UniProtKB/Swiss-Prot annotation:
Claim: Cell membrane is one of the keywords in the record: no
Residues that bind (6S)-5,6,7,8-tetrahydrofolate: L117, G121, H122, L123, S349, P350, F351
GO BP of this protein: glycine biosynthetic process from serine; tetrahydrofolate interconversion
Modified residues annotated as N6-(pyridoxal phosphate)lysine in this record: K226
Family stated for the protein in its record: Belongs to the SHMT family.
Protein name: Serine hydroxymethyltransferase
Enzyme class (EC, first level): transferase
UniProt lineage: Bacteria, Pseudomonadati, Thermodesulfobacteriota, Desulfovibrionia, Desulfovibrionales
Classification via HAMAP family: SHMT (MF_00051)
Site, Plays an important role in substrate specificity: residue positions: H225
Major localisation: cytoplasm
Keyword Transferase carried by entry: yes
Known cofactor(s): pyridoxal 5'-phosphate
Domain of life: Bacteria
Length: 412
């Protein structure tokens, strides 16, 4: 960092300020996490210099013998973690992993049945502003108005009516266990392929705390950050039968040279996921989410589906007459980072929203447990009760900073 501050003080100062933000605030964005020093070391290594188009043993460039080692380790460890026959670790993101699956199995104009974004889905699951919504005919399923949980009977009815070429399961803001076996049964009934995007829950799946889609779905995609606690990137898991098509869709289909420094960092993170400590960490993530959810519920906050089974919760602020936008801003002033989020059957725009999404992976990585979640919930409640009161929000922020700095960014 000293060298960077000398060579490029503007970028260096921005990074120093970001370190201060991360250490002095409470990170509750459900899709964010903190990686280990080992993962950061791999990602910042000389592997960033190397072009390696192709796959291990079949490169279009020379000098790839050592990056091949890194990629093979990432592949082997991913397959071991999830019990998969095949893994492609080259996708630069979860979005590109999803794109490769679509391109390998579908034709433009085919019908996809996927979860509505406002009910907890993802942009790449058919949103009209995304490539997936432009290339394919998308039919959406959602959650029950009564329970806030996926309405599997409705999914089955929609599948029978529309006969989709592919059903997509997985979400970015859904707090309950997803029944992948039920999705596969529906897919089989109508002759559809099933893709599961487990980006948010991959770490829980790795630790056996959520049913695995691998072996149930035809294709499983994920990011490698979030609960999996690796570098930002994507991955595809499937069987040997699909390998050739998937490989060719990643390269040369939608990507050129893979990011070998990121792939090495993925290998390191996957190695960490095979350690017993990783399972203990994931259990704590779930326990922390349950405690945070229960404390907020006891204070009169309404959670979509009534609670959480995983690492996140979706707080519906309608009964508090607070918008997600205002809540996010107030929390930020109080030293707590979260994101506004649409809720099922949303009445406000995506730029305003009626909810906020909260997650515990990052705080758990810092070493926080249930007792700390009660404190965090107290500050959230205080901040949301003082929207517009900048004096009180500043006081909360000072308390939050003093508390947060007691914890390192990464703790086993």
């Amino acid at each position: 960092m000293d060298e960077l501050l000398i060579q490029d003080p503007e970028v260096g100062r921005a990074i120093v300020q970001e370190v201060e933000r991360q250490t002095g605030k409470l990170e509750l964005i459900a899709s964010e996490n903190f990686v280990s020093p080992a993962v950061r070391a791999a990602q910042g290594s000389v592997l960033t210099h190397k072009y390696a188009e192709g796959y291990p043993g079949k490169r279009y460039y020379g000098g790839c013998e050592f990056v091949d080692v890194a990629e093979n380790l990432a592949i082997d460890r991913a397959c071991e973690i999830f019990g998969a026959q095949y893994a492609n670790v080259q996708p630069h993101s979860g979005s590109q992993a999803n794109m490769a699956v679509y391109f390998s199995a579908l034709t433009p104009g085919d019908t996809i049945l996927a979860m509505d974004l406002s009910h907890g889905g993802h942009l790449t699951h058919g949103s009209p502003v995304n490539f997936s919504g432009r290339f394919y005919n998308v039919v959406f399923y959602g959650v029950s108005r009564e329970t806030g949980c996926i309405d599997y009977d409705s999914v089955a009815e929609l599948a029978r009516e529309h006969r989709p070429a592919m059903i997509v399961a997985g979400a970015s803001a859904y707090s309950r266990i997803i029944d992948f076996a039920r999705f596969r049964a529906i897919a089989d009934e109508v002759g559809s392929l099933l893709m599961v995007d487990m980006a948010h829950i991959a770490g829980l799946v790795a630790a056996g705390l959520h049913p695995s889609p691998v072996g149930t779905a035809h294709f499983t995609t994920t990011t490698t950050h979030k609960t999996l606690r690796g570098p930002r990137g994507g991955m595809i898991l499937s069987d040997e039968e699909a390998a050739k098509k998937l490989n060719s869709q990643i390269f040369p289909g939608i990507q050129g040279g893979p990011l070998m420094h990121v792939i090495a960092a993925k290998a390191v993170a996957f190695g960490e996921a095979l350690r017993p400590e990783f399972g203990a960490y994931q259990k704590q993530v779930v326990a922390n989410a349950a405690k945070l959810a229960a404390t907020l519920t006891d204070a009169g906050f309404e959670l979509v589906s009534g609670g959480t089974d995983n690492h996140l919760m979706l707080v519906d602020l309608t009964n508090k007459d607070i918008t997600g936008k205002d809540a996010q801003h107030a929390l930020d002033l109080a030293g707590i980072t979260a994101n506004k989020n649409t809720v099922p059957f949303e009445t406000r725009s995506p730029f305003v929203t009626s909810g906020i999404r909260l997650g515990t992976p990052a705080l758990t990585t810092r070493g926080m447990k249930e007792a700390e979640m009660v404190k965090v919930a107290g500050w959230i409640i205080d901040a949301l009760g003082n929207i517009g009161n900048e004096t009180r929000l500043a006081e909360i922020s000072r308390d939050v900073e003093k508390f947060a700095r007691q914890f390192p960014l990464f703790h086993w």
